[in-house]
Design a protein with these regions (language model features):
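Replace the tail clause
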Residues: 1-170
Length: 170
């Protein structure tokens, strides 16, 4: 993880044995690298923003067995603070509602899935480019692909020599 709060939460909560026990007893924990799987991060970030009005990392998403998100959040401290519940409180609450109010969880997941699709469709619609003449010929595209293939690092992934870091946004 490259983000500050990801490291903080790892140190405060994930490395704490009592917290890890709660996580491992009641949940199947999956860590997704947002740089390796931006497609998954995109869906889960949409879910978090729809549910909370905010987003960021670390990003925690609770899913149904059908892999539909029903709750999400970002950083949670080890003890209540910063206007947020403790991470173990969140975990215990999610376990309780999933166990005792499964129908409500499923309804929430369905509504959220529908909303995510609507948001993505709206975004796709606004980003559509009107049909025009192709910018490049097939020959030019094939040459570009061949050039990229020649530069691809088969051992480390990506392009160029390792180490590789995400580009800056500025």
């Amino acid at each position: 993880a490259v983000c500050h709060w990801c490291h903080v939460m790892e140190r405060e909560s994930f490395e704490d044995q009592a917290t890890a026990d709660v996580m491992n007893t009641h949940f199947i924990n999956i860590k997704v690298d947002r740089e390796e799987r931006p497609d998954i991060d995109h869906i889960f970030m949409n879910a978090c923003q729809i549910l909370t009005g905010a987003g960021g990392w670390p990003l925690h998403v609770f899913l149904t067995p059908e892999r539909k998100p029903f709750s999400a959040g970002t950083y949670f401290p080890p003890k209540p603070g910063y206007g947020k519940p403790a991470w173990t409180q969140v975990l215990n609450y999610m376990h309780t509602i999933f166990k005792n109010e499964r129908d409500k969880v499923e309804e929430q997941a369905e509504r959220l899935a529908h909303h995510i699709v609507q948001v993505d469709q709206s975004f796709i619609h606004t980003m559509q480019i009107p049909e025009t003449e192709p910018l490049f010929s097939e020959k030019e595209l094939l040459q570009a692909v061949a050039g990229m293939q020649a530069q691809f690092d088969l051992e480390q992934g990506g392009f160029g020599q390792a180490p590789k870091f995400p580009g800056s946004m500025s």
